[in-house]
């Protein structure tokens, strides 16, 4: 009789030893062909022979399982009647967990109001379902099946008060992709934001028309909110204060009184700013 045995357990990518064993020594050299294509040689006068066969390699997407092989053909041996046991020889292939990692990169430098491109990349193409990457700035990046990266655009802040600075964003979470284990690279992606000079304009307006002796309201207006209180001195001696965070302030000034000798006219006022 001829039977087949195999290594009982091996790690992914390891080597399985298949051994064909005879109950009687071979009269001539013989070969034993297995269902996996491997061939075992048994020398004349020997009762067994072996061959090494590579177990399935490490797979980042799925766990390992069982591998079996059976005898499909024999030649030689010079036996009157050789009975080959076709029972499969089974090997447990143990899983080695593969960590796939998703990381984040960003545009290195941009101007205020410019575009920052955040790119999430994984070291093995996505299968099964898209990978959804959540960023610390509230945005998400979806890497589609078949791809290993995807990007999203972000507009750099444009601050009229304090120009320039930096942006630092990291991955908060990543899910999907049918990986055995998907890890997140916690390193932040940093972008230097260069200042673009923001011109802030101050303008002065007044009540269009008022009766002699009435009240004129002068209003100073900024195109951007004040970072600190702004004092506006008018040419008529009046002072307007614009509070921090506000864009305008007002002051009330009495118009020239009634004059029995001359008609009323126009009142013109200029402003001087003081912060």
Residue positions per predicted region:
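Extracellular acidic loop/turn motifs
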Residues: 25-29, 125-130, 225-229
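Short proline/glycine- and polar residue-rich coil/turn motifs
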Residues: 41-52, 56, 142-157, 241-249, ...
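Short, solvent-exposed loop/linker segments at the N-terminal edge
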Residues: 8-14, 108-114, 208-214
């Amino acid at each position: 009789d001829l039977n087949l045995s195999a290594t009982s357990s091996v790690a992914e990518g390891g080597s399985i030893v298949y051994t064909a064993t005879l109950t009687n020594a071979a009269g001539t050299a013989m070969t034993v062909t297995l269902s996996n294509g491997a061939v075992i040689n048994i020398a004349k006068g020997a009762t067994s022979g072996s061959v090494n066969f590579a177990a399935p390699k490490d797979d980042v997407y799925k766990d390992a399982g069982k591998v079996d092989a059976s005898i499909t053909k024999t030649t030689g041996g010079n036996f009157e009647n050789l009975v080959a046991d076709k029972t499969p020889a089974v090997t447990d292939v143990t899983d080695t967990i593969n960590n796939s990692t998703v990381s984040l990169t960003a545009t290195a430098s941009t101007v205020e109001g410019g575009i920052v491109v955040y790119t999430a990349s994984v070291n093995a193409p996505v299968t099964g379902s898209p990978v959804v990457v959540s960023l610390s700035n509230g945005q998400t990046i979806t890497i589609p099946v078949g791809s290993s990266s995807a990007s999203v655009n972000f507009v750099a802040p444009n601050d009229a008060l304090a120009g320039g600075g930096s942006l630092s964003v990291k991955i908060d979470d990543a899910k999907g992709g049918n990986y055995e284990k998907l890890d997140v690279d916690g390193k932040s992606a940093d972008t230097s934001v260069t200042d673009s000079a923001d011109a802030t304009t101050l303008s002065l307006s007044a009540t269009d028309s008022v009766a002699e002796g009435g009240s004129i309201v002068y209003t100073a207006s900024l195109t951007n909110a004040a970072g600190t209180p702004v004092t506006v001195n008018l040419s008529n001696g009046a002072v307007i204060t614009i509070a921090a965070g506000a864009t305008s302030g007002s002051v009330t000034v009495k118009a020239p009184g009634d004059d029995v000798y001359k008609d009323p006219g126009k009142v013109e006022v200029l402003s001087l700013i003081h912060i």
